[in-house]
Amino acid sequence: HTISRRQRQMCIRDSPEVEGTMGQVSADQVTLIETVEDARTVEPPAGRHLAFATQTTLSVDDTAEIISVLQFRFPDITGPRGEDICYATTNRQKAVKDIAADVDLMLVIGASNSSNSQRLVEVAKQAGAADAMLIADKHAIAWELADQAGHIGLSAGASAPESLVQDVIQALADRYNLTVTEHGHIRETVNFKLPPILTQ
C-alpha cells in the first residue's frame, strides 16, 4: 500500500492473499509475477520506479529465485523492509527443513485454506520427510500412519494457536511412550504495534 502511494510499478506473487492488495491500486500499476519465467520476461512501462512485494507466507526458497531475477534485471528495484517479511513463516520453514529428513511423519497443524501451513507440508516432503500431512487439530491425526512412525515431527502454521500444538502433543503422549525434543533456534519474540485506530 505504501509502495502504491509512491506511484511505483508493483510486482506481486499471485495468491488469494494478495487480492486485497490488488484492489488498492489501478491495474496499470500492478504486474503479477507467479514464476521465475515471468520474472525473466516481464516488461514494465519505461520510466517507472519499480518495487516488488511478495505474499509473506510463500516458500522462502521459491520467492528468493524470483526476487534474484528481478534484482538482476532491474538493479534499482525496491523491495520490502525487513519488518515486512513474515518472520514466523521463515523460521518455521527453516525448522521443518532441519528435521524433515530425520522423521517418518511430519504433522503440520493449520487450517486447510492456510497457504503457509500447506507450504510447510510441501517443505517437509521436499526436505526428506517420509510422509507429511496437514491436520486441523488432534482429532485429525492419522493414527494408522502415526502408529508406523518411529519419529514424528510437529510444526504449525503461523496463525495456529499454541493450545492446538499442546493438544496434539498430549494426544501423542497418551498413545505412545513419547520423548519430546524441541528444535529451532529462533524464538518468535517480535511484537507488532496496533494500528492507531485500535489504540484510541
Role assignments for model-derived ranges:
Residues 1-12:
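Single conserved hydrophobic/aromatic residue that forms the stacking wall/gate
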Residues 16-43, 88-92:
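Active-site glycine-rich loop that binds ribose-phosphate moieties when present
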Residues 37-46, 140-148:
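Short amphipathic alpha-helix with an adjacent loop that forms part of the alpha/beta core around
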Residues 53-74:
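Glycine-rich phosphate/diphosphate-binding loop of Rossmann-like nucleotide-binding domains
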Residues 147-200:
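Peripheral docking tails and interdomain loops at the edges
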